[in-house]
């Protein structure tokens, strides 16, 4: 089932690239303002929260499909997928902030 968004959380944003197939939804956000970190663990909390919100919303919009998120760092270019556990943790952090 889709993860719960924190009550009172307003999601306002625009997905840079959305790839939808019969089995999968891929959310890609381009990052142009800094070099890519070495791993997803180095991704800024704000980016984690942003992608977690997109992920949660699009899981509801596309039930039954795998939803994945990735950041495209344009300095490389480099495509970095964010693990589901990281997204769930970011949603928990948003819950405590609301």
Question: What positions do the PLM features span?
Answer:
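Structural signature of nuclease core domains in nucleic-acid processing machines
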Residues: 1-98
